[in-house]
């Protein structure tokens, strides 16, 4: 369990509270969560992070009015750099996007620029924004993570309390380069404790990681309360600490909530994430 869910930085969040919807553009709806809350517990310093990466958001419910008052729609893709001071709280992001619904913009590019400015200000870091037409997705198939799925092992699990000790001694033997995948990642929102469902891809070069130990570790997140981004950084740090791979990439894609999905990745090597939807997205 985390020990910062009552931190003063979280007390003003709209998450978990009844909140009215604004009908006009209002960037003040965006709320930031300091990344330092969980990074301090992991022993990470902003000036010497052991990884690079991004939080990739997909915005499925994005609409505004053009100058003629006709509603416009697009699908947004947001990449929030992992070096930003803050992550963006998802409910506030949804409320902010809804505030665009009855607001006029002269062009899609004007919307993109406004999103980039507002999100960068909230996150205190680099944010890339792409807005795509719905027609761009008509021929886009569902994807699956590359790699070996470790979910169908003949093991018994009866403890769902989070612990990274499952990874102690989990790596050994010859050096391999491989990619392991699990679709059984489930954690809970830090504030509301609502379930967050995800698939995770772990790509590494190093001593071979025991599949059973890794699966038990991932399943132990099942009753753990943290935001998506924080879980991915915890997985990265735990695998690095106990398995000591030469290179490591952790990439998770979570199911959507409120018209948004969040897909964080962290890596200490070159990595270009595939951004297509998985089956549950």
Swiss-Prot record:
Q: What SUPFAM superfamilies does the record tag this protein with? A: Tetrahydrobiopterin biosynthesis enzymes-like
> Where is substrate bound in this sequence?
88-90, 228-229
Q: Where is the active site?
A: 189, 196
Write out the function statement from the record: Catalyzes the NADPH-dependent reduction of 7-cyano-7-deazaguanine (preQ0) to 7-aminomethyl-7-deazaguanine (preQ1).
Stored InterPro entries: GTP-CH-I_C/QueF, NADPH_dep_7-cyano-7-deazaG_red, QueF, QueF_N, QueF_type2
Task: Indicate yes or no for the key word Membrane.
Answer: no
Top-level EC class as recorded in UniProt:
oxidoreductase
A Pfam family matched in the record: QueF_N
Q: How does it assemble?
A: Homodimer.
Q: Which residues bind NADPH?
A: 90-91, 257-258
Q: What is any one GO biological process for this UniProt entry?
A: tRNA modification
Question: What family does the entry list?
Answer: Belongs to the GTP cyclohydrolase I family. QueF type 2 subfamily.
Name of the gene encoding the protein in the UniProt record: queF
Keyword field: Cytoplasm, NADP, Oxidoreductase, Queuosine biosynthesis
Q: Which protein, by its recorded name, is this?
A: NADPH-dependent 7-cyano-7-deazaguanine reductase
Q: Which residues form a coiled coil?
A: none
Q: Which GO terms describe its molecular function?
A: preQ1 synthase activity
Give the GO cellular component terms, alphabetically.
cytoplasm
Q: In which pathway does it act?
A: tRNA modification; tRNA-queuosine biosynthesis
Reaction equations catalysed: 7-aminomethyl-7-carbaguanine + 2 NADP(+) = 7-cyano-7-deazaguanine + 2 NADPH + 3 H(+)
EC annotation from Swiss-Prot or TrEMBL = 1.7.1.13
Subcellular location per the Swiss-Prot or TrEMBL entry: Cytoplasm
User: Which NCBIfam families does this one have?
Assistant: QueF
> Where would one find the signal peptide in this protein?
none
């Amino acid at each position: 369990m985390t020990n910062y869910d009552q931190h003063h930085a979280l007390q003003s969040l709209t998450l978990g509270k009844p909140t009215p919807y604004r009908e006009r553009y209002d960037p003040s709806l965006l709320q930031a969560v300091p990344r330092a809350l969980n990074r301090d517990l992991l022993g990470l310093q902003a000036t010497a992070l052991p990884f690079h990466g991004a939080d990739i958001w997909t915005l499925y419910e994005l609409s505004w009015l053009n100058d003629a008052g006709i509603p416009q729609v697009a699908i947004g893709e947001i990449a929030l750099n992992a070096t930003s001071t803050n992550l963006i709280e998802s409910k506030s992001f949804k409320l902010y996007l809804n505030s665009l619904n009855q607001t006029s913009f002269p062009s899609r590019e004007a919307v993109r620029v406004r999103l980039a400015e507002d999100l960068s200000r909230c996150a205190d870091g680099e944010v890339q924004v792409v807005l795509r037409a719905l027609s761009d997705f008509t021929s886009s198939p569902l994807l699956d993570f590359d790699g070996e799925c470790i979910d169908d092992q003949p093991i018994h699990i009866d403890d769902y309390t989070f612990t990274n000790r499952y990874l102690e001694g989990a790596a050994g033997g010859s050096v391999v380069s491989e990619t392991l995948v699990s679709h059984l990642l489930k954690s809970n929102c830090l504030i509301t404790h609502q379930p967050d469902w995800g698939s995770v891809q772990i790509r590494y070069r190093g001593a071979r990681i025991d599949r059973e130990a890794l699966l038990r570790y991932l399943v132990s997140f099942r009753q753990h309360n943290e935001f998506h981004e924080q879980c991915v950084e915890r997985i990265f740090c735990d695998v690095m600490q106990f398995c000591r791979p030469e290179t490591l990439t952790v990439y998770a894609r979570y199911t959507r909530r409120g018209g948004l999905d969040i897909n964080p990745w962290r890596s200490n090597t070159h990595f270009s994430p595939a951004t297509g939807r998985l089956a549950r997205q």
